[in-house]
Each structure stands twice: as C-alpha cells, then as structure tokens.
Design a protein with these regions (language model features):
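N-terminal Rossmann NAD(P)H-binding glycine-rich loop of SDR-like oxidoreductase domains
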Residues: 2-24
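SDR active-site strand-loop-helix element
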Residues: 5, 30, 70-74, 109-115
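Short glycine-/acidic-enriched loop or helix-start segments at secondary-structure transitions
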Residues: 13-15, 38-39, 81-82, 120-122
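Glycine-rich phosphate-binding loop and adjoining beta1-alpha1-beta2 segment
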Residues: 29-56
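NAD(P)H-binding glycine-rich loop region in Rossmannoid oxidoreductase-like domains
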Residues: 44, 53-90, 101, 119
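Catalytic helix-loop patch of NAD(P)-dependent Rossmann-fold dehydrogenases
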Residues: 89, 93-97, 104, 108, ...
Length: 144
C-alpha cells in the first residue's frame, strides 16, 4: 500500500496517476480536497481509500503492516494564509509526526519540499544544507 498526502493537488494527482499507470499500489490519498471540484483530479483513479487528514494516523495504525511507502506532498500552500500556528500544526508538526511514524514502522518516507523556501531567488537556488546556507534563505511568506 502506498499513501500520497496531498494526492488531490496538482503534483500529487499526477504522482497518483503515474503510480497507478506503473502498477504500484494499492493507492491511498490523504487530502482535504478529495471531494467536490478539487476531487476531480483523482476521481478517475482506482484508489483503495481517500481519507481526510484527521483520519491519517488511525488509518496508518490500522494498515501498518501493509504500508510500503508514504509520499508526503500535503501542506497548506496558500501564500495568503497568515496564521503561523496553523502552518506550524499542519505543515511542520504533521510532517514531523508522519516522518516519525514512518521511521518507527520502517516505511519509506518520500518528502517533497517547495521552491518557496528560496524566496524571490535573489540569493540563488542551492540545496546546500549547511547552517549558513539555511540561515541565508529568505522565504516570502509562511509557506516558504
């Protein structure tokens, strides 16, 4: 079983399509936008389940033995959102908790970050993970 958080989004839905076409699966999407208009991106996919974020950890615990990999693409990406505690809970804390769950369950965790961390690009685009390079990043908003 492969889980894709943010699987109803643009990148996530394309990943789900590619995984399905390659025969990987069963596939599970975790996304708040899995229903309604945003759900059209995954409506034609053969999914084992489409779950809300609030159901994520109970679902993982129930399917622990079946889980092969987690692609973590889910996040609040709105550049207009200004609630720092919401970002901390949904983007940072959830990512950390999901990574810990995967590490504990020995499940592969694939995380996609965002170019938003670089800011306007004035400092260039470098994946240098040193403290100095990370301190130089100037994201334009809370998402970055």
């Amino acid at each position: 079983m492969i889980l894709v958080t943010g699987g109803a989004g643009f990148i996530g839905s394309n990943l789900v399509a590619g995984l399905e076409e390659s025969g990987a699966g069963p596939l599970v999407v975790c996304d708040r936008n899995g229903v309604g208009d945003d759900g059209r991106t995954i409506a034609k996919r053969q999914l084992e389940a489409c779950i809300e974020p609030e159901a994520l950890f109970p679902f993982l615990d129930t399917h622990r033995a079946e889980m092969q990999a987690v692609f973590h693409l889910g996040a609040i990406s709105s550049t207009m959102e200004t609630d720092a505690s919401l970002f901390a809970r949904n983007n940072y804390r959830l990512s950390l908790d999901l990574w810990r769950w995967c590490a504990d369950a020995n499940v592969r965790f694939i995380y996609a970050s965002s170019a938003a961390t670089y800011g306007d690009g004035a400092m260039g685009f470098d994946d240098d993970g040193s403290k100095a390079a990370l301190a130089a990043l100037r994201p334009l908003n809370l998402y970055g």
